[in-house]
């Protein structure tokens, strides 16, 4: 009788769901007001001109225009702005 007893269950095999973070609209892309530009944890990117920041640090367009990425200030912070078309 070729039987095999059941093996013990493992305690591994779990992972958290991905949060789909990152840049959603890149430099030079046209956006409409309300469009999400970046989803992030913390302020890796800062809100520039015509860009709003949500409570989870999501950056979104306040006006229609083109996305512009720039590095400014003494701390070389990355800012995202909207340029009017």
Swiss-Prot record:
Pfam families: Ribosomal_L27. InterPro entries: Ribosomal_bL27, Ribosomal_bL27_CS. GO terms for biological process: translation. One of its GO terms (cellular component) is cytosolic large ribosomal subunit. Keywords: Ribonucleoprotein, Ribosomal protein. Residues 1-20 are annotated as: Disordered. It comes from the Bacteria. GO terms for molecular function: structural constituent of ribosome. HAMAP family: Ribosomal_bL27 (MF_00539). Belongs to the bacterial ribosomal protein bL27 family. This is Large ribosomal subunit protein bL27. It comes from Yersinia enterocolitica serotype O:8 / biotype 1B (strain NCTC 13174 / 8081). The lineage of its organism: Bacteria, Pseudomonadati, Pseudomonadota, Gammaproteobacteria, Enterobacterales.
């Amino acid at each position: 009788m070729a039987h095999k007893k059941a093996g013990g269950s493992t305690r591994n095999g779990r992972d958290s769901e991905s949060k789909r973070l990152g840049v959603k609209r890149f430099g030079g892309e046209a956006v409409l007001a309300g469009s999400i530009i970046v989803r992030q944890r913390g302020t890796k990117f800062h809100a520039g001109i015509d860009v709003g920041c949500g409570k989870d640090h999501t950056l979104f367009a306040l006006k229609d225009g083109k996305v512009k990425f720039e590095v400014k200030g003494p701390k070389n912070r990355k800012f995202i702005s909207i340029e009017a078309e």
